[in-house]
From Swiss-Prot:
GO terms for cellular component: endoplasmic reticulum; endoplasmic reticulum membrane. The record marks 194 as: Stabilizes the active site histidine for nucleophilic attack. It comes from Dictyostelium discoideum (Social amoeba). Has enzymatic activity against both sphingosine 1 phosphate (S1P) and dihydro-S1P. Regulates intracellular and extracellular S1P levels. The keyword Membrane applies. Its main location: endoplasmic reticulum. CDD domains: PAP2_SPPase1. Residues 133-136 are annotated as: Phosphatase sequence motif II. Residues 107-115 are annotated as: Phosphatase sequence motif I. Keywords: Endoplasmic reticulum, Hydrolase, Membrane, Transmembrane, Transmembrane helix. It is found in: Endoplasmic reticulum membrane. This is Probable sphingosine-1-phosphate phosphatase.
């Protein structure tokens, strides 16, 4: 185990500082020390799991791991919003922020290492952030099981429309999420302790959203005053990013990812607030039928449900992609102007560089990168939840656009 112990030196506190905190039984340092010992004990478990490797499992768990990526869920969230219910998409964004954002805060707090790559085989690219908890596990369990709870327990009429029994949907969701969880072990990215911690984060996020946060969202959405609605949420998320712990081992993707998922929840909530204040018009079915008689395209689209939903998803994803590109360019263009207006001082090599002048580069600190993702994904999720207005004018509206559950 000597090699493993050597890996643990990364990001660990000095022995002097450890001694300083020994009197605090529940200090961060003592907890981290306990978790590090457990980490050392569990690395051989990963080696044992990987002793059963074969080509099929390599491929299967590589694909399963993708199903837990936050980018995958952000691409999949529009389907829930446009094909099931607008409010469902918003609440899933909140669960995404809780699971990944909360997980990243824990990652940067305890800075526990991942299984050492010189001992453990990795199926995919080596992860640059820390280990505990597994945010793939947290987001996979959190989002899929909240989807199940929302559609079969909170609003069972939605589940009935799927023509899938509750038991069947439960096993689908369980198979999906457990595949993601085991992929993190098989691929050599996490120890059992990490995925168990991710599962705890997921359960906590589901319970918090189901029994408390969804009522907070309802009160915020129905508030006629912008100050006590979206502005309150903006203040909360800004405080989270300002006080987000930074890893003492150097910058990692965890902090910017928190900005990303916070932006996803913020934009969707702002748009839902606008929906409450200015509801999307309900398409007149008689006029639609009359127009369909004269417009063969409208008639064809509405006669084939798969074509109707496919058209909505295609149009929506194109506009979401445009919103993402232009919001990012706008943020860094504005940031570039502010920086150049206030200083001409050349700094060290940036973590991320975005330049509109090929001869000059601007410096992007981790904080700026996190807030850039907050802004960009606020615009992205705002566009997603605002699409029902466009669908109305394009005559491709469905019940998902106008049904209210608050």
């Amino acid at each position: 185990m000597e090699k493993i112990k050597k890996q643990n030196n990364i990001g660990s506190y000095s022995s002097d500082k450890d001694g300083e905190y020994k009197k605090f039984r529940f200090s961060k340092t003592s907890i981290r020390g306990f978790l590090l010992k457990e980490y050392e004990r569990e690395v051989p478990i990963i080696v044992k799991i990987q002793s059963y490797r074969n080509k099929f499992l390599d491929f299967y768990f590589k694909m399963a791991s993708i199903l837990g990526e936050e980018v995958f869920f952000i691409l999949a969230l529009p389907i829930s919003t446009w094909c099931v219910a607008t409010q469902l998409g918003v609440e899933l964004c909140v669960v995404l922020a809780l699971t990944i954002g909360g997980g990243n805060i824990l990652k940067n707090t305890f800075t526990l290492p991942r299984p050492p790559p010189n001992i453990v085989w990795t199926n995919t690219a080596h992860q640059k952030d820390h280990g505990l908890p597994s945010t793939h596990t947290a987001s996979a369990f959190g989002l899929t099981f909240y989807f199940l709870i929302y559609t079969y327990f909170l609003f069972p009429t939605i589940g009935e429309s799927f023509n899938i029994s509750l038991l069947s949907m439960f096993f689908i969701v369980l198979f999906w999420s457990t595949s993601v969880m085991f992929s993190r072990l098989y691929n050599g990215h996490h120890t059992p302790m990490d995925v168990i911690a991710g599962l705890i984060v997921a359960i906590t996020s589901i319970l918090a959203t189901t029994y408390q946060l969804r009522y907070f969202i309802e009160g915020m959405v129905l508030s006629e005053t912008f100050l006590f609605g979206p502005m309150l949420y903006i203040a909360i998320l800004s405080a989270i990013l300002f006080f987000h712990p930074q890893a003492n081992t150097g910058p990692t993707p965890a902090y910017p990812e928190t900005g990303l998922v916070c932006g996803a929840s913020l934009g969707s909530l702002i748009s839902l607030w606008l929906h409450a204040q200015h509801p999307c018009p309900l398409m007149n079915q008689e006029l639609l039928l009359l127009e369909a008689n004269y417009d063969s395209i409208v008639s064809t689209i509405h006669s084939i449900p798969l074509l109707l939903h496919g058209s909505r998803i295609l149009i929506g994803l194109v506009l979401v992609g445009i919103a993402k590109v232009f919001s990012k360019k706008f943020f860094f263009f504005a940031y570039d102007l502010v920086i150049r207006a206030n200083t001409n001082n050349e700094q060290s090599q940036p973590i991320t560089t975005v330049s509109f002048d090929p001869n000059k580069k601007i410096i992007v600190t981790p904080t700026i990168e996190a807030f850039s993702k907050l802004f960009v994904y606020t615009c992205v999720s705002f566009t997603i939840v605002s699409m029902p207005y466009l669908f109305y004018y394009l005559n491709i509206q469905t019940s998902a656009d106008v049904t209210r559950y608050y």
